[in-house]
From Swiss-Prot:
The lineage of its organism: Bacteria, Pseudomonadati, Campylobacterota, Epsilonproteobacteria, Campylobacterales. Pathway: Cofactor biosynthesis; (R)-pantothenate biosynthesis; (R)-pantothenate from (R)-pantoate and beta-alanine: step 1/1. This is Pantothenate synthetase. The active site is at H37. It comes from Campylobacter jejuni subsp. jejuni serotype O:2 (strain ATCC 700819 / NCTC 11168). It catalyses: (R)-pantoate + beta-alanine + ATP = (R)-pantothenate + AMP + diphosphate + H(+).
Amino acid sequence: MQVITSVKEAKQIVKDWKSHQLSIGYVPTMGFLHDGHLSLVKHAKTQDKVIVSIFVNPMQFGPNEDFSSYPRDLERDIKMCQDNGVDMVFIPDATQMYLKNFSTYVDMNTITDKLCGAKRPGHFRGVCTVLTKFFNILNPDIVYMGQKDAQQCVVVRHMVDDLNFDLKIQICPIIREEDGLAKSSRNVYLSKEERKASLAISQSIFLAEKLVREGEKNTSKIIQAMKDILEKEKLIKIDYIELVDFNTMENIENITDNVLGAVAAFVGKTRLIDNFLVQGLK
């Protein structure tokens, strides 16, 4: 496995692979890897070569968010990648990604102003900009992203279509702890009491998905049922609960098809997200 920090060197390796007609699966991460990331690596191994990038992108964090405290453990991440058959770990620093006087950004006028985008201004501008750069540097065939960041997946798919990138976005299922909590690098922030309280998030998601699959169409009723679960936990502060069309991120009143149910909530000071996706409803 190659551990690369230079943009120039990464591009040269990719160029060599492509000259031998090798396909590339790419998993973008911010590090502090967990089983959710490793499941993406497993999917990516259907390609000839697998690249994992590790970059805590300052551009996608707001001024009062957790950029400086975001968990980091490069040595552990590199070992996990090696143990799971990754071919290249690309670990650029901010000076490699954003040169002096950097002034070019990728933004989107729709989809990004809802859900997490509404709560985190500028977040998706940072995501789209950095992924555009990674796509140009690494030239992947398929990019593997987790459904836990569902809005991000939809935003990036739209960006790929709009900008004619020659690649495919593959959305992979949420990976959960044994008790149901969605795997997240930020789970490490939780105290014992907060960890216990956080289960209300996944419980609200499971209930809502069950209601949808059983035929409930009224989103107000589903949202209220989710609120009832979350509001029982004093350590939880709801950021949003939304049921939206998965393709447009627009709120829906009556469920027809492709519904995404999404929750963001603070457990203590830690903001966690979770969701369910139901497609193919008649």
